[in-house]
Regions:
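Core segments of small alpha/beta cavity-forming domains
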Residues: 1, 74-140
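Structured interaction patches on ligand/partner-binding surfaces of diverse proteins
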Residues: 43-77
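Short amphipathic beta-strand and strand-loop transition segments with alternating hydrophobic
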Residues: 140-152
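Exposed beta-sheet edge and beta->alpha loop/turn motif
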Residues: 1-12, 16-19, 30-32, 150-206
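Amphipathic alpha-helical assembly segments used for oligomerization, scaffolding, or translocation
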Residues: 1-35, 67-87
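Short Pro-Gly-centered beta-turn/loop motif in secreted/extracellular proteins
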Residues: 21-55
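Short, charge-rich amphipathic segments
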Residues: 20-23, 27, 60-63, 110-119
Length: 206
């Protein structure tokens, strides 16, 4: 990766993780899917920080948190046209499930869109008890964007979902409102002719 003209190699990374590609080696093929974290001294957010990967492809920051920048590959129009409906369908099911008290139809609809052997599938399965309390929260999404569609292989793609939401939480003695702004990095894989969500990482500070 090259940031403001300074070339950084994997040896310069302070940490590396597979993130949303954990356990998906069967689908990513030989692609390098590591998320690398670098620490750079004397780098300021103004003027704008620019970066390209070592193949010369420009990457763009989609989230900032304190002194951290999170970069993703820019979207590919062909991939976006093919995969947007997949991402929208999954995230719509996720929003529908997470904004209500536990209800089996919403629960099974969401699980049907997730790779069964993934950590994401296990996470949703374990969420049942917590979701009984979701009826006390009203969620209104004021901004919802699907961006940075990038094909990893013939069987895997990644994108980001950026959103703002007005939340109103209620319990038996009070009501309070707050605004939530976040982004998710999502990975999807193709299995038996169907695209399924396989990874979902929150990106704070979007």
């Amino acid at each position: 990766m090259i940031v403001n003209g300074v070339e950084l190699s994997k040896r310069d990374a302070v940490s590396s993780t597979l993130g949303v590609f954990e356990g998906l080696e069967l689908y990513t093929g030989g692609a390098d899917c590591l998320t690398n974290t670098y620490r750079i001294e004397g780098l300021y957010l103004t003027p704008a920080v620019t970066a390209v990967d070592l193949d010369g492809m420009e990457v763009t920051p989609v989230a900032t948190s304190g002194s951290s920048l999170t970069f993703f590959h820019r979207g590919e129009p062909e991939t976006e046209a093919q995969m947007r409906s997949v991402a929208e369908s999954f995230f719509s099911a996720y929003m529908d499930y997470s904004a209500h008290a536990f209800e089996y139809t919403r629960f099974s609809n969401l699980l049907s869109r997730i790779l069964p052997q993934s950590d994401l599938y296990q996470y949703v399965q374990r969420s049942q008890e917590a979701m009984y309390w979701a009826s006390g929260t009203q969620t209104e999404y004021t901004d919802l964007r699907y961006e940075n569609f990038h094909r990893i292989s013939d069987y895997c793609f990644v994108c980001t979902v950026i959103y703002s939401a007005d939340m109103t939480a209620k319990n038996w003695y009070e009501q309070y409102s707050y605004k939530l702004e976040n982004a998710y990095e999502l990975s999807f894989v193709s299995t038996n002719g169907r695209w399924l969500a396989a990874g979902m990482n929150v990106i704070t500070g979007a």
